[in-house]
């Protein structure tokens, strides 16, 4: 009976430490993968010009590492290269690139540039739900709640189950009622 309580506490501590160890290991694995991808793209870009899809992937890695200036450069390069290819399915990729560049500028705190890129993505694909959500978020940031709400309404007409649009629209409605 006397040994049962310490054994119980040690068991709980061991389980907690095992879970913590697993979480740290997963985080380290993610960091090492990101670093190896970044090193791969840096080495490859120094030796030769990256393909458009490689520039796009490199820009995504740079965003994950919060290297926004490098991500903007690579994103612009990928955009230029995709425009030069003249492939029919390019419009979807170009809209994705515009949206990604908008996201990068938004994360860097430059909302006016971000807004322009989101609008360009929507000119190419007016039903691009992610770009609509992102543009609505910018309108929320600048306190233009009517435009934000109308964009969220458009998102919900395209995708009724969009959690982001539902949540943000409810938030705007609560904000208006205060």
Curated annotation (Swiss-Prot):
What keywords would UniProt list here?
Chloroplast, Plastid, Repeat, TPR repeat
InterPro entries for this protein: TPR-like_helical_dom_sf, TPR_rpt
Q: Where are the TPR repeats?
A: 52-89, 95-128, 129-162
Q: Does the keyword Chloroplast apply?
A: yes
* Highest taxon, organism lineage: Eukaryota
Subcellular locations according to the entry: Plastid, Chloroplast
GO terms under cellular component = chloroplast
Gene3D superfamilies of this UniProt entry? Tetratricopeptide repeat domain (1.25.40.10)
Instruction: Fetch the SMART domains from UniProt.
Output: TPR (SM00028)
In Pfam terms, one family for this protein is: TPR_19
State the family named in the UniProt similarity comment for this chain. Belongs to the ycf37 family.
- Protein name in UniProt: Uncharacterized protein ycf37
**Organism, as annotated:** Pyropia yezoensis
